[in-house]
Amino acid sequence: MAPQRRGPPRIPEGSSAAERRRATSTKKDRLPREAQRTWLRIVAFGVGLALVTCLLWSSVGIDDDVAEVVARRGEVLEGRFIEVPCSEDYDGHRRFEGCTPRKCGRGVTDIVITREEAEQIRRIAEKGLSLGGSDGGASILDLHSGALSVGKHFVNLYRYFGDKIQNIFSEEDFQLYRDIRQKVQLTIAEAFGISASLLYLTKPTFFSRINSTEARTAHDEYWHAHVDKVTYGSFDYTSLLYLSDYLEDFGGGRFVFMEEGSNKTVEPRAGRVSFFTSGSENLHRVEKVLWGTRYAITIAFTCNPDHGIEDPVLT
């Protein structure tokens, strides 16, 4: 019997085709996974870019409507004044010759109040506001009326805390407050060419502390545009003394004079005094504070002695 010759082992029919199908399938599987990873990288990059943009946006407190910065935080201004036409708001009130605005405008100076004085008076605000504070982002302390934000309401701190006030504030605190008020009053009188003796402190004059906490009541919504003469009536000249620094202590929170086509903004700086006539010629608002805490004091003056208030005293 002749020996049988064995050939090479037979490969099952269709096995190479199966391998080709598996290889093709593997490639097909790999492609979606690679595409997925590519898209994930793109999405991650996009999210990262958006986050960085938001952080940068927040850090500088950009406002689309602001066209010009008239006083930057880093500047030390001896005095800058911009004259604007007076509105008709003053015509609806009793006029006082030599005082009621006939020259209108806005000014900024960094040499009237020192940074040391600003730090000292800020400590007065911090002591008073430590007794309460709004549930929302804006708290006020009025040493004249005693109004203090507490939760969603206001209390009279002199009645509420009674004799304990003597342990919180000092005579030196109130003397500093009076000295600063007088310096600001003289600055306004000189800028507008009127006699300081014709100006009377008026209400409300108050400390403000603003942070990024969500508003809880209408009193916390400080960012709406308004006209002081319309809102308060008694105001003829408004001033703000800033007690903290933009972009160091807080972001956002710049002061914006609203003008058609070209808004003007003031960047707060501790010791900076911003002042202006209170009519519609100086429609304004404050940007929302995005982070940190912004301190300031609003000091308002009237030409009407009937609307005047006395300096606060520690009794």
Curated annotation (Swiss-Prot):
Q: Where does 2-oxoglutarate bind?
A: 294
List keywords of the entry alphabetically: Dioxygenase, Glycoprotein, Iron, Membrane, Metal-binding, Oxidoreductase, Signal-anchor, Transmembrane, Transmembrane helix, Vitamin C
Q: How is the cofactor bound?
A: Binds 1 Fe(2+) ion per subunit.
- Write down the EC number: 1.14.11.-
Indicate the segments forming the Fe2OG dioxygenase domain, all copies.
Answer: 203-305
What highest taxon heads this organism's lineage? Answer: Eukaryota
Query: What topology in the membrane does the UniProt record assign?
Result: Single-pass type II membrane protein
Q: Tell me the enzyme class.
A: oxidoreductase
Q: What GO CC terms are in its UniProt record?
A: membrane
Its family? Belongs to the OGFOD3 family.
**Mind telling me what this protein is named?**
2-oxoglutarate and iron-dependent oxygenase domain-containing protein 3
